[in-house]
Amino acid sequence: MTAFMVVSLVVVSQAQQTVVDKTVATVTDGVRTELITYSDLRWQLALQPNVQISPPSSEDLNRALRLLIDQRLFALEAERLPREAPTKAEITAKINEIVSYFPSSAEFERRLQAVGFKSVSDPSFEAIISERIAIDKYLAFRFRSFIVITAADEEQYYREVFIPEFRRRNKGVIIPSLQSRRTQIVEELTEQRVAQQIETFLDEAKRRAQVVILNPV
């Protein structure tokens, strides 16, 4: 590994501060290597509402690092499959979704500018969103599309989870029928199984891949 990969000597001015960017971690599957830089961590924090970014805390930086390691593992797997680049409409829709989590679009742009982007239309920012969309598509294909929820699954969840939880929260209220809550139950079961499969995938991917922390945050 070259010295450039360990510490990049790019100095950027952000919010009147001078920050030396550096490679925090590498993730490799033996064929390809993904880098995670300090800027990547700050960019991730900028996308999270109510998280301080100037200066960021060590706790938040490490939380962002764990998330980005997972994303890099997904990206390495996604690159094995043929895919079309996200469209401009998909990128715009994803940006609008992220903006909706903030008090205003102005507040979101202020956070982007604080970590070095010019606006939501900054090509570098759009490239990050494009990569996130590609990962989302991979997850939908790899996990969600193969999940089957049977009638027996629905009935068991309704009996063992939905009814006890409904009674706990709504004392004295008539319990809705399974039929009336079937869509909700299928969605909840699907999300549970997706989460379980993703957790299993990440555990296995981390055993196969090599994650090296070069500069602790």
Language model region names:
Residues 1-10:
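Bacterial N-terminal signal peptides
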Residues 11-15:
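Sec/Tat signal peptide C-region and signal peptidase I cleavage site
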Residues 16-26, 30, 55-217:
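Peptidyl-prolyl cis-trans isomerase
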Residues 17, 21-49:
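Periplasmic POTRA and POTRA-like interaction domains that precede
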